[in-house]
C-alpha cells in the first residue's frame, strides 16, 4: 500500500524472476537435522528445515512448469532423498504432507526506501527467496532500524 503511494518519478524497482520454483512440503515428521541443510546437486537444489522437534519443512527445486497436483507425497520424498547425502538420507523420516505447494522464486528491491516521512519496510521494500525464512527477518530488521531512529533523535534533543 505504501509503495503505491511513493512518487513514481522517484521510485526505482529491480526484480529478478528465477527460472525455477521450490516444491515445498510441511510435515509432522522429525527433522533430518537440527541445522539447515542446503543441497546443491545435479538433480537440483534441496533444503531441509526444522520447524520443531516434530515438524519439518522441505523443498526441492522444480521447473516453473511443474504443477503441485502432478506430485505425490511419495514422489516428493523419493526426490528429496535422491538429493541428500547418505547421512541425511538415512535420517529422513517420511510421512503425510500437512501442506504441499510450489513457490515461484523472485527477488525484488525498491529504492529509495524513504519518501519524506514515509518509509518502505518488509515486502514493500524488498523480497527475497524463502531461504531460511529471511524475508520476515528482513522485515523485523527494517522495523527495528525505523524504531531506533526517532528514539535516538528524541534522546539527542533532550
Model-derived features with residue positions:
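Conserved FAD-binding catalytic core of PHBH/FMO-like flavoproteins
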Residues: 1-105, 110
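Conserved mid-domain beta->alpha element of the FAD-binding
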Residues: 2, 101-157
Amino acid at each position: 500500500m505504501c509503495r503505491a503511494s511513493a512518487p513514481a518519478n522517484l521510485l526505482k524497482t529491480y526484480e529478478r524472476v528465477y527460472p525455477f520454483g521450490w516444491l515445498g512440503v510441511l510435515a509432522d515428521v522429525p527433522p533430518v537435522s537440527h541445522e539447515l541443510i542446503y543441497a546443491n546437486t545435479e538433480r537440483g537444489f534441496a533444503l531441509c528445515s526444522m520447524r520443531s522437534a516434530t515438524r519439518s519443512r522441505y523443498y526441492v527445486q522444480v521447473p516453473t512448469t511443474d504443477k503441485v497436483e502432478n506430485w505425490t507425497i511419495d514422489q516428493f520424498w523419493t526426490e528429496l532423498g535422491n538429493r541428500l547425502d547418505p547421512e541425511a538420507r538415512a535420517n529422513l523420516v517420511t510421512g503425510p504432507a500437512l501442506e504441499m505447494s510450489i513457490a515461484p522464486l523472485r527477488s525484488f528491491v525498491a529504492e529509495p526506501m524513504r519518501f519524506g516521512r514515509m518509509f518502505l519496510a518488509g515486502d514493500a521494500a524488498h523480497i527475497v527467496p524463502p531461504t531460511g525464512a529471511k524475508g520476515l527477518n528482513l522485515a523485523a530488521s527494517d522495523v527495528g532500524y525505523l524504531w531506533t531512529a526517532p528514539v535516538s533523535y528524541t534522546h539527542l534533543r533532550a
